[in-house]
Amino acid sequence: MTKTFANPQLTKNGELKHLLSIEGLSRDILTHILDTAKQFVSVSDADREVKKVPLLRGKSVFNLFFENSTRTRTTFEIAAKRLSADVINLNINASSTSKGESLLDTINNLSAMQADMFVVRHASSGAPYLIAEHVAPHVHVINAGDGRHAHPTQGLLDMFTIRHYKKDFSNLTVAIVGDILHSRVARSDIHALTTLGCAEVRAIGPRTLLPSGLEHMGVRVFHSMEEGLKGVDAVIMLRLQNERMSGALLPSAQEYFKAYGLTQERLALAKPDAIVMHPGPMNRGVEIDSAVADGVQSVILNQVTFGIAVRMAVMGIVAGNND
């Protein structure tokens, strides 16, 4: 008899109560998040006098970032505040975890303070899953990046950005370029693109920075930028994750740029209306040329803006679903 495993992200009714990974979520769930995010975009309009809605009024959201972050932590904080939540940013370096307290003991103590939601970034893959297993039924966990494993809200905001500019995934070719081996963003993007029916997903990079098994995920692999960029609709550039590398996987940053840096000449191989994306932080002159990053086809800053609406949508949806 085949043993089936329940998805820990879902309620018994199949609704999203935690967001831990895009893997295992249906197209309907992803589309619902993207559609909800579209409704929240107007909350951040510059001409809107009060940039708030009362969806999470009275709820406490704890941001627990055990790794450094600028865009993700800040946009989660803005998103929670625009939903009218009370936001607590834990200073990890000054917390009891720096004195040897375990992750679960930290979570249990914060839960005793009536936390309603934890937004967690951690260097260890699977840490948000561990937390989700041990919180009370009414508490929700959102993964803001765990090791190499997943970065689901980045994947979702990337999908929102692509859909905003390209509408329909079914005719698109999307290339993900760079250090895919160490990238949680790449994994989340690949799962999201294939789930949403993207016509073709490409991975471009040196052999040393591409994980095995990409073909089994429905990805076409290229080791040449010139070949991989031909006719693509969107290019997602990734930085070199030097902090996760062990050993000499590359000769030098300069040599990497010569082979895999996105220049205007290489971008010209894509479709004329192709968009350029990057999850940040960017390393100009390593994976992307400044002329491209700041060019007319770049939507990198728009990704950051859309990230607020997407994270508002995720928080609002999970907060409404309990077992």
Curated annotation (Swiss-Prot):
GO molecular function: amino acid binding; aspartate carbamoyltransferase activity
The keyword rRNA processing appears for this protein: no
SUPFAM superfamilies named in the record: Aspartate/ornithine carbamoyltransferase (SSF53671)
Pathway given in the UniProt record: Pyrimidine metabolism; UMP biosynthesis via de novo pathway; (S)-dihydroorotate from bicarbonate: step 2/3
Reaction(s) catalysed (UniProt annotation): carbamoyl phosphate + L-aspartate = N-carbamoyl-L-aspartate + phosphate + H(+)
EC number: 2.1.3.2
Database matches in Pfam families: OTCace (PF00185), OTCace_N (PF02729)
GO terms for cellular component: cytosol
GO biological process per UniProt: 'de novo' pyrimidine nucleobase biosynthetic process; 'de novo' UMP biosynthetic process; amino acid metabolic process
Keyword field contains Transferase: yes
Residues reported in the UniProt entry to bind carbamoyl phosphate: R71, T72, R121, H151, Q154, G280, P281
Keywords, ordered alphabetically: Pyrimidine biosynthesis, Transferase
HAMAP family in alphabetical order: Asp_carb_tr
NCBIfam families: asp_carb_tr, PRK00856.1
Subunit structure: Heterododecamer (2C3:3R2) of six catalytic PyrB chains organized as two trimers (C3), and six regulatory PyrI chains organized as three dimers (R2).
Recorded family membership: Belongs to the aspartate/ornithine carbamoyltransferase superfamily. ATCase family.
Protein name: Aspartate carbamoyltransferase catalytic subunit
Originating species: Ralstonia nicotianae (strain ATCC BAA-1114 / GMI1000) (Ralstonia solanacearum)
